[in-house]
Each structure stands twice: as structure tokens, then as C-alpha cells.
Amino acid sequence: MSEVIEGNVKIDRLSPGDGKTFPKTGDLVTIHYTGTLENEQKFDSSVDRGSPFQCNIGVGQVIKGWDVAIPKLSVGEKARLTIPGAYAYGPRGFPGLIPPNATLIFEVELLKVN
């Protein structure tokens, strides 16, 4: 099931979560993710590192695409997020890894909301 939200961020739900525990603005979340460019070139993966990523969601600690998409997921849910450049790293990109204005694709699993 696909859903397009703010900023043309697309959420493709891969497997359901608990359906009731959704992060709210400012919550600490624990996420496993793999990030790729549209050409499928991987640029980062918490899965490969064997260490989930933690951040406070909705408060600008991460790219805007995550801030708007992660609160739509429930604990345990896996999803593919397609995030246009304006809601990712924008015109600056991330030198050496992500070109300017690149659309990013993340496979994410919301492990925990603290």
C-alpha cells in the first residue's frame, strides 16, 4: 500500500507494525534503515553496522522526509520511504555520498518508541 504525504514523500508499507504505537513529535525512536540512491547505490545502513539508529523525531535532527514519514509508522512496521531531494539533503547533497537534489530511498523498520 502506497501513501504520498507532505513534500511528495512516498511511503510503501512492506510489513505491518502493531498499529497503535506511533511516534509523536520529540519522541526518541530507534530505527534500522538502509539508504540508497535511485540507482540502487547504497550510501548508508544501520543494518550493515549492526547498530540501530536513534533520534528524536519531528524536531529537525534528521532529514525532513524522516520527520514527516516516521510518525506515520507504528512500532514493528517496515516501510520503503522515497524522499525527494527537497526533503532530503537538498541542493547541497552530502559531498562524496549523495549528489545535490538526489531522491533517496530508505528501507526502514521502526523498532522502538521511547
Curated annotation (Swiss-Prot):
Record domain PPIase FKBP-type: where: 26-114
Signal peptide limits: none
Enzyme Commission numbers on file: 5.2.1.8
Pfam families documented for this protein: FKBP_C
Cellular component GO terms, alphabetical: cytoplasm
Superkingdom of the source species: Eukaryota
Family matches, as Gene3D superfamilies: 3.10.50.40
Root EC class: isomerase
Regulation: Inhibited by both FK506 and rapamycin.
GO biological process: chromatin organization; negative regulation of homoserine biosynthetic process; nonfunctional rRNA decay; regulation of chaperone-mediated protein folding; transcription by RNA polymerase II
Subcellular location: Cytoplasm
Catalysed reactions listed for this entry: [protein]-peptidylproline (omega=180) = [protein]-peptidylproline (omega=0)
Alphabetical keyword list: Cytoplasm, Isomerase, Rotamase
Alphabetized GO MF terms: DNA-binding transcription activator activity, RNA polymerase II-specific; macrolide binding; peptidyl-prolyl cis-trans isomerase activity; protein folding chaperone
Family as reported in the entry's similarity comment: Belongs to the FKBP-type PPIase family. FKBP1 subfamily.
Function: PPIases accelerate the folding of proteins. It catalyzes the cis-trans isomerization of proline imidic peptide bonds in oligopeptides.
Name of the protein this chain belongs to: FK506-binding protein 1
Organism listed in the record: Eremothecium gossypii (strain ATCC 10895 / CBS 109.51 / FGSC 9923 / NRRL Y-1056) (Yeast)
Organism placement in taxonomy: Eukaryota, Fungi, Dikarya, Ascomycota, Saccharomycotina
Gene name linked to the record: FPR1
